[in-house]
Design a protein with these regions (language model features):
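Active-site beta3 strand of CheY-like receiver
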Residues: 25-31
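Receiver (REC) domain active-site loop signature in two-component systems and cognate sites
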Residues: 36
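C-terminal output helix
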Residues: 87-96
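Two-component/phosphorelay signaling modules centered on CheY-like receiver
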Residues: 1-10, 99
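Short, conserved "switch-loop" micro-motifs in signal-transduction and mechanochemical regulators
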Residues: 65-66
């Protein structure tokens, strides 16, 4: 979806690999599931917020865990947006668009 819309997408197999990639480059926004091997999305968000170089990076969590307790926990960790599956493609694109515009205004590559 995002590539089709012209965005450059960098993939990671899990949270640990995502953190490694974030040391190499800074995307405009991070999209993460909760359920991943080695490091889940909650731990990824916690690590991003604990890193002074990444702490303001927008995080969109996309997950099948739609219970309120999961959403609340994500928000407590600093997740910016929480989308339950199935989600609206337009909603996701709108969020990504807003974050990439903000990043472009700050000189961050989208």
């Amino acid at each position: 979806l995002l590539q089709r819309e012209g965005y450059r997408v960098v993939l990671a197999a899990d949270g640990l690999q995502a953190l490694e990639r974030l040391q190499e480059e800074r995307p405009a926004v991070v999209l993460s599931d909760i359920e991943m091997p080695r490091m889940d999305g909650f731990d990824l968000a916690r690590n991003i917020r604990a890193d002074s170089a990444l702490e303001d990076m927008p995080i969109i969590m996309i997950t099948s865990r739609i219970a309120g307790k999961h959403r609340e926990h994500a928000m407590e960790l600093g997740v910016n947006n929480y989308l339950g599956k199935p989600y609206s493609e337009e909603e996701l694109l709108s969020l990504v668009r807003s974050y990439t515009r903000a990043a472009a205004a700050q000189g961050v590559v989208a």
